[in-house]
Amino acid sequence: MKVLALFLLAGTVAFSQPKATAKAATAPILKHQVVKAYPHDREAFTQGLFFQDGQLWEGTGLYERSGLRRVELATGKVLQVHPIGEAYFGEGLAAVGNQLFQLTWKNGLMFVYDKGSFQLQKAFRYTGEGWGLTTDGKQLIMSDGTSALHWVDPLNGSRLATIRVTDGGREIANLNELEWIKGEIWANVWQSNRIARIDPKTGRVKAWLNLTGILTAAEAQGTDVLNGIAYDAKGDRIFITGKLWPKLFEIRAN
């Protein structure tokens, strides 16, 4: 499909051709408040992120550098790490039960690990690219760089359902890292400083969160894009970071 580029503030959000004709309302843009900043490994090309058991779990990308890691929130210290192999570009990461699931970008493989030991148990094949991954607690939800979100069975890797994400009647492409937060899917949009809050039933964007300027000019030197959302359900805390970012932020949406 033809892709139209629409520049929104400091970020770029890619839209595919509209399926709806006209004057559909676009979702509101929310402001954010930084609650606290934590150190983040500047060598971590963050592709997947979630918070569980009082710790961060992070999947990193780039060929020859991709891995899986468990991280101490307060210090950013890497407590456990598992390289996934030089031939793989790691992507989204999620946990269901005692298993970790990690996507690869173009290898068409989803790796399944034991959560405690990081030992590889098996791999599922899928078509297309792998970008973001989260879970609603039962099923995996996967993005592939388009406007699609796929529900995936964690038992066998089969796709169960697909929705298209839209705002104002236009499909939102480049959906990247994902997080399930209070019944919504939050999604980074590649090459954008915004996060989309998505209704998982309809695919409609309910609101945008604008994170432009969260890094100072000095902090932004040598970094890549915003990517990484984690939710602490017990503490009701939201964390965000980016690829090669020096900080991870706890934020509150206003």
Where are these regions (language model features)?
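Beta-strand-rich domains and repeat architectures in extracellular enzymes and scaffolds
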Residues: V35-G67, H82-A94, G242-L244
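Short loop/turn segments that connect beta-strands within beta-propeller blades
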Residues: E72-G76, D114-F118, P154-G157, D199-G203, ...
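Conserved beta-strand positions in repeat-built beta-propeller and related beta-rich domains
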Residues: E58-L62, L100-N107, M142-T146, A187-Q191, ...
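Hydrophobic, well-structured mid-protein blocks that either form specific transmembrane helices
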Residues: M110-G168
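Surface-exposed loop and turn segments in beta-propeller and other repeat-based domains
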Residues: K36-Y38, L79, P83-E86, T162-E171, ...
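Beta-rich, blade/repeat-based domains predominating
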Residues: R42-D53, E86-G97, Y126-Q139, G169-G183, ...
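A short helix->beta-strand "capping" segment at the edge of beta-propeller domains
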Residues: A22-E43, L73-L79, T212
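Blade-loop segments of beta-propeller domains
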Residues: T75-V112, F118-G130
